[in-house]
From Swiss-Prot:
PTM notes: Phosphorylated by MAP kinases.
Phosphothreonine sites (modified residues): 114
Name this protein carries in UniProt: Profilin-1
Pfam family, any one: Profilin
Motif segment (Involved in PIP2 interaction): 84-100
SS bond partners: 13-118
Entry's family note: Belongs to the profilin family.
Amino acid sequence: MSWQAYVDDHLMCDIEGHEGHRLTAAAIVGHDGSVWAQSATFPQFKPEEMNGIMTDFNEPGHLAPTGLHLGGTKYMVIQGEAGAVIRGKKGSGGITTKKTGQALVFGIYEEPVTPGQCNMVVERLGDYLLEQGL
């Protein structure tokens, strides 16, 4: 399966039990900031934004004072799992990022999708990739 198929079929799909509800944008990005696959709607990000996210995975709490920035959008960092998941909120939407051995899985959402639904979609794929050694 191609990386694009993972994004299209496992991240940008309808959320279980909520036909028509799906993430706004999604991507799989290597730890080095290289895009493996992304939805057409995923924002263009700066290398320093990705560096900040990677730093927060290695030093949990790094982004808390400044927020998580992606594609020029600032998200307030909320509870996550140190070294594994970063979650952010902006207005009625937000972002979930799951770190795997080689990649970061991103999901961005807006209402009516809930934070919990975004977390479920992103973390399920991230956990699968971890199980595959990726």
